[in-house]
From Swiss-Prot:
InterPro entries: Cyt_P450, Cyt_P450_CS, Cyt_P450_E_grp-I, Cyt_P450_sf. Pathway: Steroid metabolism; cholesterol metabolism. Its EC number is 1.14.14.-. The coexpression of CYP90B50 and CYP82J17 in the yeast strain RH6829, which was engineered to accumulate cholesterol, leads to the production of diosgenin, the main precursor for the industrial production of steroid hormones. Belongs to the cytochrome P450 family. GO terms for biological process: brassinosteroid biosynthetic process; brassinosteroid homeostasis; cholesterol metabolic process; saponin biosynthetic process; steroid biosynthetic process. This is Cholesterol 16,22-dihydroxylase CYP90G4. Mainly expressed in leaves and seed pods and, at low levels, in flowers and stems. One of its GO terms (cellular component) is membrane. The chain crosses the membrane at residues 4-24. It is found in: Membrane. SUPFAM superfamilies: Cytochrome P450. Involved in the biosynthesis of spiroketal steroid and saponin natural products from cholesterol such as diosgenin and analogs (e.g. furostanol and spirostanol), plant defense compounds used as main precursors for the industrial production of steroid hormones. During the 5,6-spiroketalization of cholesterol, catalyzes the hydroxylation of cholesterol to form 16S,22S-dihydroxycholesterol and, possibly, the subsequent conversion of 16S,22S-dihydroxycholesterol into 16-oxo-22-hydroxy-cholesterol and 16-hydroxy-22-oxo-cholesterol.
Length: 481
């Protein structure tokens, strides 16, 4: 009898497992996935995808896949099944449906470096709270006053240190410029203080590992980034403790009282770990993209003398107007007058692609143009592929700021997504544009410059980088105001 029951149980189990396998297979095969190749086991095509390439091209990998499969294809990246989108319409759908159809999904290795509470990787209610803090911090009211003033002061500090006919590593100077702005606003750091320079050095090591291969081995960029993270957090925590102590003692500093660190300590219930990850991430986000865009502007402009001439005329007119009015510092009205400068900034962001792609995942089954994106799959909107598609931008690899003049703006705007889009659009977008414009204002009035190494082209690695540091030779611009 027992043998009969045992046989019945075994046969029933086999039948159930067969049915489960059959229905799972049916469910799996019902999707009409985009074409593509899943590459090698586990790693897929990650190394090909991340292979360094020119920042002003899609790169050989993307060009090859688009030629073979079209602008939407499947692959495996970072160990996950992934739909890659070089399609502007799908990218807009992804950005505009955050939390409805798609959500943030950065690789575990990136989350480990940026932290559990990073605004970039976290989702849900805590993300909304942290994002509201960052949006309030980078509000238009602060841009018009605090950030504009510090951007100008930092630009002048950097540019006034240059000597006639000297060679400058422009990439390093751009990083110094934007780092000083963001750390002044977040922690009231003095750009002349050695501790600010030491912190910037740690951030350089940190950034190199954020998007590196996640090999936690001695000497790897990933291991160095984890080490730098600890040092940076220790520095920030030290500043927090100093601030808390001074607040308790009733000692107030007008500058410190208005920075981000003081605000979150006084007006939020965030934990120490949440504040540490927030500050770490906001310095990273407010520094890297802005510095890359500033360096790219210095790279593109010498190849376009007509743009330099038009910029010079625009900024000389602003300077003459200020001199006549007895004003010295730039105002928000001055910034709004920089119409052609805004065209140059947009074109720099489009062609330079400071943000190449973002990480998302589908939280529902999505059907688009006949293809299925299964729930749970990673989705990778590739921004650079949209910006460099001739269907979206005429002669896309040509630096042409005039394409952004008012008559053309509306037709280009829907395909322009340098900072992502939707609810997760970069909170520092307007700050980055402001910083580049202010830097252009002063460098155009003070200097002529040319590239020392014409072969030192920007590459994506996957952050924007100049292998030789973008060396430029500067000459003083005669004062014509």
């Amino acid at each position: 009898m027992s043998n009969s029951y045992l046989s019945f149980f075994v046969l029933s189990s086999i039948l159930v497992l067969t049915l489960i396998f059959f229905f799972m297979k049916r469910k799996k095969t019902k999707f009409n996935l985009p074409p593509g190749s899943m590459g090698l086991p586990f790693i897929g095509e990650t190394f090909g995808y991340l292979k360094p390439c020119s920042a002003t091209t899609m790169g050989a990998y993307m060009e090859n896949r688009i030629a073979r499969y079209g602008t939407i294809y499947k692959t495996k990246l970072f160990g996950e099944d992934t739909i890659v989108s070089a399609d502007a319409e799908l990218n807009r759908l992804i950005f505009q449906n955050h939390g409805k159809l798609f959500d943030t999904n950065y690789p575990k290795s990136i989350a480990e470096i940026l932290g559990k509470w990073s605004i970039l990787t976290i989702v849900g209610d805590v993300h909304r709270e942290l994002r509201n803090v960052s949006l309030n911090f980078m509000s238009y009211a602060r841009l018009k006053t605090h950030f504009l003033k510090d951007s100008e002061n930092s630009a002048l500090l950097v540019l006034n240190s240059w000597k006639e006919n000297c060679t400058i590593e422009a990439q390093s100077e751009a990083k110094k410029f934007t780092f000083n702005v963001i750390t002044k606003q977040i922690m009231s750091l003095d750009p002349r203080n050695p501790e600010t320079e030491e912190l910037r050095d740690e951030y350089l090591s940190f950034m190199n590992g954020v998007v590196s291969a996640p090999f936690n081995l001695p000497g790897t960029p990933y291991r160095k980034a984890l080490k730098s993270r600890k040092i940076i957090l220790k520095f920030i925590e030290g500043k927090m403790e100093e601030r808390i102590k001074r607040n308790q003692e009733g000692k107030k500093d007008l500058e410190e009282n208005d920075d981000l660190l003081n605000w979150v300590l006084k007006h939020t219930n965030l934990s120490t770990d949440q504040i540490l990850d927030l500050v770490l991430g906001m310095v990273f986000g407010g520094y890297e993209t802005s510095s890359a865009a500033t360096a790219l502007a210095m790279y593109f402009l010498p190849g376009c003398p007509k743009a330099i001439q038009q910029l010079r005329e625009e900024h000389q007119a602003i300077a003459r107007s200020k001199k006549k009015a007895g004003e010295v510092e730039l105002t928000w009205d001055d910034y709004k007058k920089m119409e052609f400068t805004h065209c140059v900034v947009n074109e720099t962001l489009r062609l330079g692609n400071v943000v190449r792609f973002v990480h998302r995942k589908s939280i529902k089954d999505v059907r688009f143009k006949g293809y299925d994106i299964p729930c749970g799959w990673n989705v990778m909107p590739v921004i650079s592929a949209v910006h460099l598609n001739p269907s979206n931008f005429e002669d896309p690899q040509h630096f042409n700021p005039w394409r952004w003049q008012s008559g053309n703006w509306a037709s280009l705007n829907s395909n322009f997504m340098p900072f992502g889009g939707g609810a997760k659009i970069c909170p520092g977008m307007e700050l980055a544009k402001l910083e580049v414009a202010v830097f252009i204002h002063h460098i155009i009035l003070k200097y002529n410059w040319d590239l020392v190494d014409v072969d030192d082209k920007p590459i994506i690695h996957p952050l924007v980088d100049f292998p030789k540091g973008l060396r430029i030779r500067v000459q003083r611009q005669p004062t014509l105001i």
